[in-house]
């Protein structure tokens, strides 16, 4: 049996551009793609913290070191420059490997530069 687990997350990254008439997808600074282990053309989920929108698209490379997060195509109607979003990718993990699985959790500063990399979501407490 396989389970779908969180593989990668870029947490609270700011949208820098929205390009309605671009071909589609989400352009992500290549440094962040590498840190999160997200491949070009990989399916990603985007959760907009500002407005609650949730949608699925795919990742393309943005200029390395630029901090670029460009929401493109029809998805551009679901975000605005300055919105904080979470970008996530999932993987099918065999049941035997679930306990050993560690996601890549990337945290950024206000310029979308990586500040921290974690491999575990902390337990939520009251």
Swiss-Prot record:
The keyword S-adenosyl-L-methionine does not apply. Pathway: Cofactor biosynthesis; (R)-pantothenate biosynthesis; beta-alanine from L-aspartate: step 1/1. Keywords: Autocatalytic cleavage, Cytoplasm, Decarboxylase, Lyase, Pantothenate biosynthesis, Pyruvate, Schiff base, Zymogen. Its main location: cytoplasm. It is found in: Cytoplasm. Its cofactor is pyruvate. The keyword Signal does not apply. Transmembrane segments: none annotated. This is Aspartate 1-decarboxylase 2. The gene is panD2.
């Amino acid at each position: 049996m396989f389970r779908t687990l969180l593989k990668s997350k870029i947490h609270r990254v700011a949208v820098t551009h929205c390009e309605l008439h671009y071909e589609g997808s989400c352009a992500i600074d290549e440094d962040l793609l590498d840190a999160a282990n997200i491949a070009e053309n990989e399916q990603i989920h985007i959760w907009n913290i500002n407005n609650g929108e949730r949608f699925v698209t795919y990742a393309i490379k943005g200029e390395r070191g630029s901090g670029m997060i460009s929401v493109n195509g029809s998805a551009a109607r679901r975000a605005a420059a300055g919105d904080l979003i979470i970008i996530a990718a999932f993987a099918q993990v065999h049941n035997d490997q679930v306990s050993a699985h560690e996601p890549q959790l990337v945290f950024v500063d206000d310029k979308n530069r990586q500040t921290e990399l974690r491999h575990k979501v902390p337990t939520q407490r009251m």
